[in-house]
Amino acid sequence: MFVTKRIGPKSKDLGKIKKLYEEAFPENERFSFSMMIKNESGHYETFGFYKDGAFCGFAIVLNSLDISHIIYFATLPEMRGKGLGAKALAAMGRIESGRRIIVDIEREVPDCEENEIRRRRKNFYLRNGYSETEVRYRWQDEAYEILVFGGKLSKEDFGNFWKNLGINKNTSEG
């Protein structure tokens, strides 16, 4: 059975989540793990995913206005390719019902050796009900695009999401 749990700062699984977070995301793409888990701003939510009682992945979501932005999403390497990512996204859709859910993915760029994995990642989200948007931006010298579930998303919506959090996000094509 697949289960999704909200994770708080005293969860027994924080060590597993932090380990996967550090393994799955390069250091230059990571925020302060403790800041997100403590959630003093009230904008972060952390979810753990479990298959038959065993931890298999997590998502960290940043909420603003009517948008839930999955900023980190990972499953254990040995659990990939088993449909658990799709189950996790479906669970997120139920939990965040009535809100638009967005993800950012690295865009394909000419002569990039990671284009195949970027294409597969994008197709994974599209197969799971996400749609393309007009939103493109650059961060840490990387080109990103936004996909959305549960509605549409404009550049203005994306800018307002960040503005509401007190952050000025440049959505130029870059």
List where the protein language model places each region:
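Conserved beta-strand in the GNAT
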Residues: G48, A54-N63, I67-A74
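Short acidic/glycine-enriched loop/turn segments that link adjacent beta-strands
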Residues: D66, W139-A143
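Short amphipathic alpha-helix that is part of the acyltransferase structural core
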Residues: M1-F31, Y144, E156-N164, T171-G174
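Conserved acetyl-CoA-binding loop of GNAT-fold acetyltransferases
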Residues: N123-T133
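Conserved GNAT acetyl-CoA-binding A-motif
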Residues: E96-I117
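Conserved acetyl-CoA-binding loop-helix of GNAT-fold acetyltransferases
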Residues: T75, G81-I95, R118
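Active-site rim helix/loop that mediates acceptor-substrate recognition in acyltransferases
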Residues: E22-K51
